Each structure stands twice: as structure tokens, then as C-alpha cells.
């Protein structure tokens, strides 16, 4: 089974009053992909009440309940029914010690982490902490039309080799727009994709997502 994570970011099309309408476009699929959506933090409570899909946060903190103004406690996520989160996205980068503390807490609480990295060196650094997913997204390709599977296939292969023999699944993001991009990524050893604008800002989000996950 492969994994497709759709990051809704804070795109107006899928946020706030538009979140429920956006999600109503989709139905669970029977196929080779598990679908996971990542709404904005302000929409997580609504997401938790939507039983059709699994939802991950876009960011989470290791700090517990308490005097932590502005933080997003992992414990609170779990109590809300959210079972995982993206971490260290290029639009929300974190210090390495913060990432390590968060990974350690997530491991104890059985909370899934999708750790974003920008290069193979960064991927290798976090190997010993065994994130559930490692998502390779070079910053310069995010939101563009050039797929990482075309521009930097050798780095995908390097990261797959780094995590060979572990329980970590490698995802590929940045510029993923077509089924061929997905097939090429999987051919390089990836176990799924992390996408955003190619689905959320599409004129037909359902069609765009289906075109990515209908492997032949």
C-alpha cells in the first residue's frame, strides 16, 4: 500500500468556511493508495469529526498541556482524534533539537510523523530517530511545475537507500502534478507522495488527485 498525503496548507479553496465543501468532493478510494489530508490547524476540529478520511496536522509541538502560548501540543492532537502530523515543512522549518524532541515524544505516544527534509544529508541525520515517513521536498521545486522525480531523481534514490531496512517510508513531494511523476517516483523506490497545490488549486481537485493515484 502506498500513501498520498494532500497538504491543504492555508489555501482559501480548502480552508475555513470552504473546508467542508472541499472535503465533500472526495470519497475514500479502493486501490493502491491510502489517502490522508492535512488541513490548516484551525480546521482540525472539523476534520476530526469527518469520519471518511485520516487527517494529519500541518505542525505539532512536543510541549504538553500547560503554559505554552501559541504551541500545538501533541497531547491535544491525540485527544482531538488526530493521529499524525507533518513536521519541518520547508514553509515551517524547525531547529534540529526541536525535531528530535518531537520525534522522541511521537514514538512514545504512537503518533505518526511525516518529517520533511530538503536533501539527503538532512535525511541521513534523522535516520536513527526512525520517523514514520520521510518526505523529500527540495525547497526550490515546491509549488512549481517541475517534478522532483525529474529534476533530482538521484537524491530520491539516495534517500531510499539511507532508509533501506528501516520502518520508515519515503515520500516524494515538490512539483508532483501528473501520474507519470508518481510512477517515476515509485519506480525510484518511494512509497508515496506529498502534494498540495496540484490538487487543492486545481479546477477539478478530485480528478487531479485521481490522476495521481490511479497506478497502471
From Swiss-Prot:
Pfam families hit by this protein: TIM
InterPro entries for the chain: Aldolase_TIM, TIM_sf, Triosephosphate_isomerase, Triosephosphate_isomerase_arc
Recorded metabolic or biological pathway in which this protein acts: Carbohydrate biosynthesis; gluconeogenesis; Carbohydrate degradation; glycolysis; D-glyceraldehyde 3-phosphate from glycerone phosphate: step 1/1
Record's keyword terms, sorted: Cytoplasm, Gluconeogenesis, Glycolysis, Isomerase
Primary enzyme class: isomerase
Annotated compartments: Cytoplasm
Family in the record: Belongs to the triosephosphate isomerase family.
GO molecular function, one term: triose-phosphate isomerase activity
Organism: Thermoplasma acidophilum (strain ATCC 25905 / DSM 1728 / JCM 9062 / NBRC 15155 / AMRC-C165)
EC numbers for this chain: 5.3.1.1
Chief location bin: cytoplasm
Source organism, top-level taxon: Archaea
Positions bound to substrate: 7-9, 142, 175, 196-197
Positions annotated as active site in the UniProt record: 89, 137
Entry GO terms, CC: cytoplasm
HAMAP family (alphabetical): TIM_A
Protein name: Triosephosphate isomerase
Role according to the record: Involved in the gluconeogenesis. Catalyzes stereospecifically the conversion of dihydroxyacetone phosphate (DHAP) to D-glyceraldehyde-3-phosphate (G3P).
GO biological process, one term: glycolytic process
